[in-house]
Every structure is written in C-alpha cells, then in structure tokens.
Amino acid sequence: MAATKVVLDNQDGPVILVGHSWGGAVITEAGNHPKVVALVYVAAFQPDNGETVLHWLQTFPPAPENGVLPPDAKGIVYYDKAKYHAGFCADISKEESDFMYASQGTFYAKGFTTPITRAAWRDKPAYGVVATEDKSIAPEIERSMYKRSNTKITEIKGSHVIYISQPKAVAKVIIEAAVNASKSK
C-alpha cells in the first residue's frame, strides 16, 4: 500500500487504478486516494470492508488445475510448477508460461489474510473483467463480488492472465473507465 500511495501522490492528474488477482485488494484500499477516479478489477478480488481475499477464495471450490501451494516457513506463497500453465495461463504459449513462472515475484500469504478497512468501490466507479476460463479465481467468485458491488461487468473468454491473452478486450474496459471518468468531471 505504501508504494502505491507514493506513486499516486506523484501523479499530476486523475488516476484509474487497475488491479489483477490479489492486486484487486490493493486497489480496493488504495482507491480511497483523492486522485483515484475509478477502479478496474481484472480477474481480481474485490473484498468489502472487513473481508479478506482468503474469505472469497473459500466461497467456491478451487479448480483441479489450481496450483497455489501453502505458504512456506517464511510465509511466501508459490504456484506448483507442474500446474502453472493449465491453472494460471492456459491460453498463452508454454514458452510464455515458463517465462512467467520463472520471473514471478514474491507474494506473502498475509496478502490473502489482511482485511480491507475501507472499500473504495463503495464511493467510486468500478469496472470488473471476469475471465470466464480462470482456474486461479473461479469466475463465479469474480461475478459474485462484482455483482454485489454494482461493478460494471465485462466477461471475456480467457485464463487468469486475460490481460496478456486478450489485451485489446481488457484495454477497452480500462478506456471505458477513463472516458466515463472524464465525462463526470
């Protein structure tokens, strides 16, 4: 959150925050910044006040392809390499998948268990992309979160990395958020 706030503080104008996966929880909190005018959730979690990502993960059984492993002794979460392509990014090439696996950043489990204190989508326009072939976050979870928050929903056929496999369709949603934000000024 602190790094996101620094970036937002340094912007000259209005900001559209885009979050993917657990990054949806980040934009849900960071979106309270006064420069943020809209939120775009791309195959992302959208918790409410007091909720966690883990809460939502537990609302629907995981796909058999899902390869998220339990945290290690340091609290770091990894994805099972054998399930990575099918469970995370089945609609991109195996070469791209192998590169993504090798270059993934560190993710601490506390990101799944930290509750939201103030959900920005309660006060700001929100847009949600449901990745209909997502094996990491069940599309049913994405739809449930987005519907209860009155988020404008766009469904796109693709895996959890919909922003890579369907970049034009995802960009169209982000552009729509920006255009609508500029109209409401």
Label the predicted regions.
Residues 39, 125-134:
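Conserved strand-to-loop "acid loop" that flanks and positions the catalytic carboxylate
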